[in-house]
Amino acid sequence: MSTGKEKMKGKGKDGGGNEVVLCSFCGRGSDEVSSMVAGPKAFICDRCIMSSVEILRKEISAIKPTAQAVSQPFQPRLLNPKSIMESLGQYVIGQERARKSLSVAVYNHYKRIESQEWVRDDDDVVIEKSNILLIGPTGTGKTLLAQTLANLLEVPFTIVDATSLTEAGYVGDDVETILARLLQASDFNLERAEKGIIYVDEIDKIARKSANVSITRDVSGEGVQQALLKILEGAVVGVPPRGGRKHPEQQLINVNTRNILFICGGAFEGLDKIIGRRVAKASIGFGTAVKAQQLESDPEILKEVSQDDMHEYGLIPEFIGRLPVISTLDPLDSKALRNILVEPKNALIKQYQKLFEMEECELVFEDKALDSVVEIAIDRGTGARALRSVLEGIMIDIMFELPSMSGVRKCVITEAVIAGEGEPEFYYEDGKKKKTA
C-alpha cells in the first residue's frame, strides 16, 4: 500500500520510461493528461486548471454588474417640479408658495448639474448656481423642507448651526467644518458629497449689528459671511478628513462646492419692521408712521422683502447676491398646527401610535384632546416644535407605565388628560375599562 507521500511523487514509470506523477487535486496521472504544473510539494493538471478558471469566471461575472454600478457616476434622483412639490406636501403642511419656489429652484439646480455632462465647451450660456434663503418664524418647517428634499432626491444632507461658525483663527468652527460634515454624511464618498445639500440654520444670527461699516472685528457676524462667500458661490476647498482645524502637515480632501446646494434659513426677527417702514415711506400722504405700524403687524409683510431690506438687517450685499432665491414661510395658525398633528406621513400622532402598536396597544386621541394640544402649542409661540414638547410632557408617564401593564389593548387620550385633570382610559382584553395607569 502506497503512502500519501508516494502518491504525490508518482506511481512508477510510463511506457517511455518517464516517471508518472499524480495531480494533487483530482489524482490523475501525468500519463492521463496533457500537462502537469509542479509546485513546491504538489502538482496540478491542466484539467483542474481549466475547471478552476471556469469557476472563477462565473464568480467574477456575478460580481461584475455590482462593480459596474459602483463605478457609474452618481446622479441624484431628478423629479419634475410638480412631483417635488407634491412629495413635499406629504410631509410639510401648507406653505404652498415656499414649496413651489423650492421645487423649481431644486429642479433647476440638479438639471444644471445633469446638463454639465453634455454641454459644449464653446457654449456661451453658463447656468449659475442658485442657492436658497428661507425666511419664516421658528417652527414653520424650514429645516423639515430641506431635510425632506434631500431624502426625496437621495443626496447627502447635513445641517449646520450658523451661530457655531467663526472666522478662521478664532475659537469656534471654521466654515470648512460644514463641508467636513457633508463628507461624513456621504460616508466620505467625494462624488456624492459634491452633489449634496447643506442647510445652514439660524443664518440671521450672523447678520452684523448695523448696515454701517464697523472698524471692530465681528468674528461671528460679517466675518462669517465673508468666509462663506467662496463656498456658496463655488470653489475647491481643502477639508480636514476628520473635521477639526487645519494644520500644515495634515493631508486635506479637496471638495468642489460648485454643485453643492446651500439652503439657508432663519426667523429674521425684526425684518417685518424694516419692510413696513420701507413700504410706508413709498406711500404718499399723512399717517406714514401709523401705516408702518399696520404693515408691521401684517403676517403677509415678509412677502414684500427686498435685497435692500436684507442689507439693512445686516447681511452684506455679496452674501445676499449668493442667495438669489428668497422664499418666505407663513406663520402657522391653529388649523395648520391641527393638520400637522395628524396629516403628514410622519405626523406626531402617527409616531406615537406606532410606538403603542409595538406594545400591542391601540392609541386614540379624541378630537377635543387634539384641539387642546394645539391651543397649548400656540401659547408657547414656537410653531410646530411646540407640538412635540406638549405631547412628550403628556405621554411620558403613560409610556413609562404601559410596558408593565398586561392585557391593555387600547388607550384613549381625552381632553381632561391634556389639561392635566384626568387619567387616560385603558381598555383590556376582556373589554373592561380602567381610568388609571
UniProtKB/Swiss-Prot annotation:
InterPro entries: AAA+_ATPase (IPR003593), ATP-dep_Clp_protease_ClpX (IPR050052), ATPase_AAA_core (IPR003959), Clp_ATPase_C (IPR019489), Clp_protease_ATP-bd_su_ClpX (IPR004487), ClpX_bact (IPR046425), P-loop_NTPase (IPR027417), Znf_CppX_C4 (IPR010603)
GO terms classed as biological process: cell division; proteolysis involved in protein catabolic process
Cellular component per GO, a single term: HslUV protease complex
Superkingdom of the source species: Bacteria
Domain ClpX-type ZB: 11-64
GO molecular function, one term: protein dimerization activity
Family matches, as Pfam families: AAA_2, ClpB_D2-small, zf-C4_ClpX
UniProt function note: ATP-dependent specificity component of the Clp protease. It directs the protease to specific substrates. Can perform chaperone functions in the absence of ClpP.
Family from the record: Belongs to the ClpX chaperone family.
Assembly and interaction partners: Component of the ClpX-ClpP complex. Forms a hexameric ring that, in the presence of ATP, binds to fourteen ClpP subunits assembled into a disk-like structure with a central cavity, resembling the structure of eukaryotic proteasomes.
Full protein name: ATP-dependent Clp protease ATP-binding subunit ClpX
Species this protein is from: Chlorobium phaeobacteroides (strain BS1)
